[in-house]
C-alpha cells in the first residue's frame, strides 16, 4: 500500500514508481472511528470484469484513429437541418456468439453492426450505456465506472476501434449517459469516504425509491464537475458524436416517484430540482 499526501488545496497526491498498464488498484480510505472503505477509482479508465471491481491502469495515448474524414464533416452531417435516424442497441444482447462465449468483443461487433445499420438506412446508433456497471440486468443504467467502457466487451482500445469503425462507415455514435442516479454498491461512489460526497445526506433528497439508487447532489461544484467532465471525456477520448441523457424527468422533479413526506421542497416551496435544472443548462 502507498500513502497519499494531502496538499494545501485539499487534494490528495500520490506517485507510485513502476506502474504499468494492466496493474489493478483500489483506494483504501480510513475514516474516523476506525472504519475502512475500499473503493474503485471514480476516474479510472478501465475496470476489472464483473464480479471483480478493482480499477485497471491503462494507456489511452496509443490508439491511432482513422476517422479523420468523419470528424471533419460531422459538424455538417449532424447539423440542425441534417436528416438523422437513430438505431438504439444494447451491445451485449444485439447478437450473441455461438462458440460458448458470453459476448462478442467490441472489435467483432463493430463491422457487423455497421453493415446492419447501413443496410437499414440509419445514420446513427445509440448505444445503451457502455460505461462500467456491476449488474447485467440494469442494461448499463446503474453505472459505477463513468470513465471506463465496460470490460464485458473488451478494452478501452477495443471500444475505440468500435467507434472508429462506425465512423469509417459514416455511422455516428450517440452514447446513453446516466447523470441522474448511481447504485449503492459499496466499492462505488456511495458514501465514498464514509460520508455523502456525491449524494445527499438526507434520504428524502438522496435516495431514489423506484430503482433503489442514489441521487446526485447537483448543488456541489465537485459533483457537477465530475459529471460535466465525464461527458466531455467521451467526446474527446472516444470521439462520441452525442449523448442521450437518461431519466431526465427524475432529475427535474424532487417528488419524482415519491409520496408525500418522502421528499423535500426547494427554497421556493416547489417540486423543481433547481440545482439539477442549473446543471442541465
Describe the role of every protein-language-model region.
Residues 1-2, 25:
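Beta-strand-rich binding/interaction modules
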Residues 3, 10-12, 113, 117:
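Extended, compositionally biased low-complexity polar/Lys-Gly-rich tracts
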Residues 3-6, 148:
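Structural signal for conserved beta-strand scaffold positions within catalytic alpha/beta enzyme cores
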Residues 7-88, 93-101, 108:
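The feature marks proteins involved in alpha-glucan
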Residues 48, 68-81, 90-272:
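Substrate-binding/active-site clefts of carbohydrate-active enzymes
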Residues 126, 276-281:
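Aromatic-lined carbohydrate-recognition surfaces of secreted/lumenal glycan-active proteins
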Amino acid at each position: 500500500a502507498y500513502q497519499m499526501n494531502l496538499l494545501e488545496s485539499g487534494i490528495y497526491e500520490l506517485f507510485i514508481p513502476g506502474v504499468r498498464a494492466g496493474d489493478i488498484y483500489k483506494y483504501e480510505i480510513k475514516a474516523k472511528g476506525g472504519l475502512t472503505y475500499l473503493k474503485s477509482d471514480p476516474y479510472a479508465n478501465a475496470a476489472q470484469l464483473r464480479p471483480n471491481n478493482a480499477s485497471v491502469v491503462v494507456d489511452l495515448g496509443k490508439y491511432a484513429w482513422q476517422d479523420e474524414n468523419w470528424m471533419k464533416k460531422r459538424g455538417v452531417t449532424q447539423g440542425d437541418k441534417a436528416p438523422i435516424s437513430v438505431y438504439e442497441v444494447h451491445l451485449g444482447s444485439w447478437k450473441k456468439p455461438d462458440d460458448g462465449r458470453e459476448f462478442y468483443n467490441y472489435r467483432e461487433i463493430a463491422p457487423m453492426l455497421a453493415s446492419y445499420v447501413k443496410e437499414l438506412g440509419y445514420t446513427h446508433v445509440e448505444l445503451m450505456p457502455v460505461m462500467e456497471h456491476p449488474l447485467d440486468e440494469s442494461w448499463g443504467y446503474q453505472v459505477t465506472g463513468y470513465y471506463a467502457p465496460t470490460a464485458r466487451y473488451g478494452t478501452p482500445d477495443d471500444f475505440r476501434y468500435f467507434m472508429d469503425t462506425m465512423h469509417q462507415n459514416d455511422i455516428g455514435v450517440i452514447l446513453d449517459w446516466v447523470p441522474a442516479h448511481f447504485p449503492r454498491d459499496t466499492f462505488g461512489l456511495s458514501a465514498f469516504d464514509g460520508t455523502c460526497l456525491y449524494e445527499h445526506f438526507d434520504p428524502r433528497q438522496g435516495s431514489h425509491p423506484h430503482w433503489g439508487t442514489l441521487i446526485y447532489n447537483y448543488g456541489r461544484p465537485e459533483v457537477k464537475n465530475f459529471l460535466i467532465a465525464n461527458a466531455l471525456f467521451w467526446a474527446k477520448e472516444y470521439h462520441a458524436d452525442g449523448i442521450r441523457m437518461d431519466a431526465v424527468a427524475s432529475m427535474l422533479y424532487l417528488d419524482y416517484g415519491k409520496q408525500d413526506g418522502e421528499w423535500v421542497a426547494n427554497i421556493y416551496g416547489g417540486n423543481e430540482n433547481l440545482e439539477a435544472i442549473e446543471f442541465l443548462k
